[in-house]
Amino acid sequence: ATGASKWNDPKDFPWTMGFQPSYRVEARIFAKYILKNKPDAKVAVFYANDDFGKDYVTGLKDVFGDKASSIIVAEESYETTEPSIDSHIVKLKGTGADVFVNIATPKFAAQAIKKMAELEWKPMHLMTDVSISIGAVMKPAGLEASEGVLSAGYLKDASDPQWKDDEGMKKFMSFVDKYMPGANISDANLVYGYAAAQTMVQVLKQSGDNLTRENVMKQAASLKDFAADTLIPGIKINTGANDFAPIEQLKMMRFKSGQWELFGDIISAETGG
């Protein structure tokens, strides 16, 4: 699945449920982080002119609420057909923003990081987890230029030594060794797929002997505090009849010395409204 908010629409699509946190959820969490850590922020939003980018802008405004027009000093969209987005970054720097929300796909996210370094523009920089690949984004942009960029995550990184003694990660590793020997454990899709499959197993367990389409869907919408082995500790899966968004929590992370480091508490996307 993608992070499109359309996956969480039980009224119009009662048989469809995504898995990963939606773009709107991640944007809400970024907005909460900004309000807590930089309450007088002047935010520049750089986003793709498509559903992905627009979902993000909506999520930011969900949390900023009535203050959105004063907090967000610039909204700049780009087309995915553009060869370079440098002119957009120059324009956004000129707004005097001290927070930059980078809602760009990998190619353009890397361009943004690189151009910001050239301009010596150093706002608080929050970047969508769509573009957190070290190989596809941070290295092409320059590791030094990428230093300090913020994002948020929900999955453990199998290649990160901090999880080597983690019980959940040990189960994942033994599964991969048994069924996929030689697989590249640094591929985040393996960790993601394992968590999604483990959640599906939980749904089937809850379904018991009643494996009708209706009951399986009912159980998928009745998950309570399920913790898959490869989710970051503290992040739980919860669904309901009117809530088809399994993961609505993230943990902030910072790019430091060539790798992502988790920090702070788990942040929920709940807005209370």
Language-model-derived ranges and their functions:
Residues 1-76, 125-151:
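Extracytoplasmic ligand/sensor domains, especially the bilobed periplasmic-binding protein
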Residues 178-191, 201-260:
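Segments of small-molecule ligand-sensing domains
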Residues 1, 42-47, 96-106, 112, ...:
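Periplasmic-binding protein-like
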Residues 26, 56, 108, 168, ...:
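Catalytic-loop motifs flanking and including active-site residues across diverse enzymes
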Residues 13, 116-192, 266-270:
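Extracellular/periplasmic periplasmic-binding protein-like sensory domains
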Residues 35-40, 61-69, 90-97, 114-121, ...:
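Sec-exported extracytoplasmic/periplasmic mature domains
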Residues 26-29, 77-91:
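Structural motif
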